[in-house]
Amino acid sequence: MQLRTETVDIAGWTVVSVFGEVDVATAPDLKERLTGLVNEGRVKLVLDLSGVDFLDSTGLGMIVSALKRARTHGGDLRIVCTEARITRLFEITGLDKALTVMPTVDAAVAGS
C-alpha cells in the first residue's frame, strides 16, 4: 500500500498526518520527510498516525530516529494514535515511556 502524508503548521508545531502502511517499503520515505522538516528548522513535530492501517518494526525504528533527531535539535516529537493495535505496539516495546502519545492532534499540540 502506498503511503501518503499531509503537513500543516498549528500553534508552532508541524503536524504530519500519515495515511496507509508504515513498513519496510514506506518507512524510508517517511523518515526522509521528517528529516527534511527538522533540517528546515521545524523541530516541534506531531506525527498523526490516525490514518495508519499498519506499523511494523521498521516504522517503529523510524519513529525513534525521528524523535532523536528532533530532540537533538532542541525540539520534540509527539504521536497521535487511537488505533489500539498500534498503541499496543508502543506499550509492548516500551516506547510509550519515551514517546508522548496523545489521542488527538489538539491534545498533542497543547501538550496535555
Please give the residue ranges for each predicted region:
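Residues that form or immediately flank small-molecule/cofactor binding pockets and catalytic motifs
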Residues: 10, 84, 106
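Amphipathic alpha-helical interaction surfaces in cytosolic regulatory modules
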Residues: 24-98
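Absolute protein N-terminus
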Residues: 1-3, 112
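STAS-typified acidic loop motif
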Residues: 3-32, 51
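Residues at or immediately preceding the N-termini of alpha-helices
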Residues: 27, 105-106
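Short acidic-hydrophobic, aromatic-tinged amphipathic segments that line or gate anion-handling sites
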Residues: 100-104
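A charged, well-structured terminal subsegment
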Residues: 106-112
